[in-house]
């Protein structure tokens, strides 16, 4: 069983977090030094040794496409020669994810999304930021390596995120042949369809536009971020498409478009899952994929906690 995410804190918890930052930082450094010593002692007694560069080389060999010259993928934190004791895959390498990975002795983290708050993982503006520094210090203390796998995981055939989300939702037998994210189902109401999705994904903050009684038969899914144009305008305009499912989008693009469709009399619906929720299954599948060519160490999926909650849940 993978390490469970902690629930997203209520807003007041951040004040306590800020007050205790320095104390927690010292505690993490002490604990990290002890854990690193344990890892080194274990490695001396184990015949299966693998370093970061070997893992990276195997990933590059297995993705099935040439490695891009311009890409966000690659080693974000750590060096190629560090010994790997265990691997965690995750949608987003939050500090909470890193803490749970370290506790499970997984010191190489394969993340789909950025670690340092921008798509390019640019850290220049963060040089003196206390949250950034705390995260870096935790990783250094626990000898954690971060490798990003975004562009090439999407670039695989089939797309690694798409494959994992189909498995996670139980939609594998519903995809329209030779389509990109199009599915057909036996007719059910939007209320029932969205509830089934929420249950499968453990989603607690998905947002829905449309009549709860709307019959759902044909669905277009686009995981992660999706723009109306040029990504989804043709699909959303199709009269035979009942529902669009995305991870996130701008409210003045796809959201407004679907609202206007409904106001004009069209039978349409939109589900916004949240970015992490909409790609989490893809990184769960990534762990399964990597186990086939990384036998030396454990490979586990460590889910990122859904960051949002609804007031009624508190």
Predicted feature locations:
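N-terminal secretory signal peptides
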Residues: 1-23
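Hydrophobic structural segments
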Residues: 22-314
């Amino acid at each position: 069983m993978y390490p469970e995410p902690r629930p997203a804190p209520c807003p007041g918890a951040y004040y306590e977090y800020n007050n205790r930052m320095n104390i927690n930082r010292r505690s993490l450094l002490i604990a990290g030094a002890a854990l690193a010593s344990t890892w080194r002692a274990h490695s001396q007694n184990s015949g299966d040794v693998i370093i970061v560069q070997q893992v990276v080389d195997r990933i590059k060999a297995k993705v099935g496409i040439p490695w891009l010259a311009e890409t966000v993928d690659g080693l974000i934190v750590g060096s190629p020669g560090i010994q790997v004791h265990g691997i965690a895959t995750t949608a987003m390498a939050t500090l909470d994810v890193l803490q749970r990975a370290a506790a499970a002795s997984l010191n190489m983290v394969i993340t789909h999304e950025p670690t340092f708050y921008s798509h390019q993982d640019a850290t220049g503006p963060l040089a003196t930021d206390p949250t950034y520094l705390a995260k870096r210090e935790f990783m250094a203390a626990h000898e954690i390596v971060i490798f990003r796998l975004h562009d090439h995981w999407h670039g695989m055939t089939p797309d690694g995120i798409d494959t994992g989300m189909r498995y996670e939702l139980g939609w594998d037998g519903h995809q329209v042949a030779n389509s990109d994210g199009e599915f057909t189902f036996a007719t059910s109401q939007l209320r029932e369809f969205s509830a089934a999705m929420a249950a499968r994904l453990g989603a607690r903050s998905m947002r829905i536009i449309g009549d709860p009684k709307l019959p759902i038969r044909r669905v277009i899914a686009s995981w992660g971020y999706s723009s109306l144009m040029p990504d989804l305008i043709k699909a959303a305009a199709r009269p035979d498409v009942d529902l669009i499912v995305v991870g996130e989008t701008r409210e003045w693009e796809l959201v407004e478009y679907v609202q206007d469709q409904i106001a004009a009399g069209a039978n349409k619906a939109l589900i916004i899952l949240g970015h992490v929720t909409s790609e989490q299954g893809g990184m769960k599948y990534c762990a399964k994929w990597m186990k086939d060519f990384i036998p030396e160490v454990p490979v586990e999926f460590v889910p990122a906690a859904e960051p949002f909650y609804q007031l009624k849940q508190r």
